[in-house]
Amino acid sequence: MLIKRFKMKLGTKILCLVFVVILLFSASVGTVMLKEITESMKQMATEKAKGDLALSSTYIDDVMSGDWQVKNNKLYKGQTQINGNEDIVDLLGEKTGDTITIFQGDTRVATNVMKNGERAVGTQASSEVIAAVLKKGKRFYGQADVAGSSYQTAYMPLKDQNGNIIGMLYTGANQSILASLTQSLFTQFAIVLVIVIMVSVILVLVFTRKINKRLNALKSAFESAGNGDMTIEVSDKTGDELSELSVYYNKMRMKLNDTIQTVQQSALQLASASQQLSAGAEETNQASEKITEAVQQIANGAQDQITRIENSESSLKQASADIRDISANTAAIADKGQLAQSKADIGQKEIANVQAQMDAIHQSIQKSGEIIHQLDGRSKQIEQILSVITQIADQTNLLALNAAIEAARAGEQGKGFAVVADEVRKLAEESQQSAGQISKLIIEIQKDMNRSARSVEHVKTEAAEGVTMIQRTRDAFKEIAAATGEISAEISDLSASVTNISASAHQINDSFAANTADIKESTKNTRQAAALTEEQFAAMEEITAASETLSQLAEELTGIISQFKMINQAENG
């Protein structure tokens, strides 16, 4: 109860924490600052006392000429008596704002320090000051007790003309001034502290309000998720830890949503499978009953089968003998088929040789035709040459005639030339006659070559037809050889098959005997199977009961999962 009563929210905790931290920090800073300020003020007061001491000493030297001296047990400055001289100390006190005292030895003889409402004349300085100033001849600066009050003081020794210390000059600032100044600073610090605390509280409130808003969004999302609603998504893009927490929540939400949907689908599948299992078990029970009846029928029919097998065994032996005869006949047919295939192969080779010879004859005829064609061309060339020779002979005869005429004109000088021209004419005439005879022979040769060309063409046609017929004959022999080979192969396969059938028949005959024993054993096993089937029927009844229980569990799981609101359901809604 106490824990619940003092339970605070996160914003209140942060506010209290910030408040405590500010207070501790302010207290620490205030303490250090107060100490530093106090020390600084004391230092400033001491420095002021130093300056005022020098000012007072200089002022006294200015207004009072002469050395310090003691006459008639009185302290003098020059000719001015210091004992009871209140004017000088009051004047210096007004100028400096300090307390001023002039000592004769260690005793105050002139001072503006008040004690119990009177000037503290006749009182002594503190032992610390006496030891430092009067005995050691040094100046003293610092805090000292003055007539029962604490001051920041400055002391200097007063010496006569011989250098003997005969007294002291003192200036001091009262600590009450420091106390009031310190109190004023502390008051200002407290005011600033209160302002800082108020501003901090406001900033913390604004900050915690924003955080509370973001935390409330997360809280609402987690609360909805706890109640089964997975549709709420938290969007926080500030980039801090709460933003990361939002991202992790969204990832968790999606993962949990997928997991629950998977479980839901699995539960539905489980329910469906359990129903199918129950239905299958029921069908199996029915099938088991039918199997029991069938097994019993099989057992009853096994004996009848044994009787039929024994009757078939004698028939199988006769079939085996017939198969052996078929195997022998098939082997003889296979030998004849191989012989026919051998003859077909020989005929195919002979046809191939004849075709090769016909191809050679056909090629020779083609070459003869080409040669005759070439001779016809050559005879035409010779005919052209003879024509040229005839033309040359005609021209030569004409030239010889002209030469004879010219020789006759020349008389005796042309007789020799006339003889030569006559011989040339004779040669030209003989050339013409020879060319005519050759032309006749060439015409006869051309006629013979034309007849030969026609004969060669006819022979070529006949040879081509012979090659075609031989090719057809060769193709026919190939088909005969192939068919004979196929028949031989089929006969060989048939022979092998018959041999295998014969062997199988022997095996079947042997197997019938073994099967008879196996069927007897099977009958025994069938009766045992009937008993096992009854046991299986009882087991299937147990499976049916278990599947019904599984179906109930699946329905309960589906009901539990239906309490969750999925993301896909919200989108479809």
Swiss-Prot record:
It is found in: Cell membrane. PROSITE patterns: CHEMOTAXIS_TRANSDUC_2 (PS50111), HAMP (PS50885). InterPro entries: Chemotax_Me-accpt_rcpt, HAMP_dom, MCPsignal_dom, sCache_3, Sensor-like_sf. Residues 1-13, 208-573 are cytoplasmic. It holds the Pfam family MCPsignal. The chain crosses the membrane at residues 14-34, 189-207. GO terms for biological process: chemotaxis; signal transduction. One of its GO terms (cellular component) is plasma membrane. Residues 35-188 are extracellular. The modification Glutamate methyl ester (Glu) is found at residues 535, 542. The modification Glutamate methyl ester (Gln) is found at residue 276. Keywords: Cell membrane, Chemotaxis, Membrane, Methylation, Transducer, Transmembrane, Transmembrane helix. It is a multi-pass membrane protein. Residues 209-261 form the HAMP domain. Residues 280-544 form the Methyl-accepting transducer domain. One of its GO terms (molecular function) is transmembrane signaling receptor activity. Belongs to the methyl-accepting chemotaxis (MCP) protein family. PANTHER family: METHYL-ACCEPTING CHEMOTAXIS PROTEIN MCPB. This is Methyl-accepting chemotaxis protein TlpC. It comes from Bacillus subtilis (strain 168).
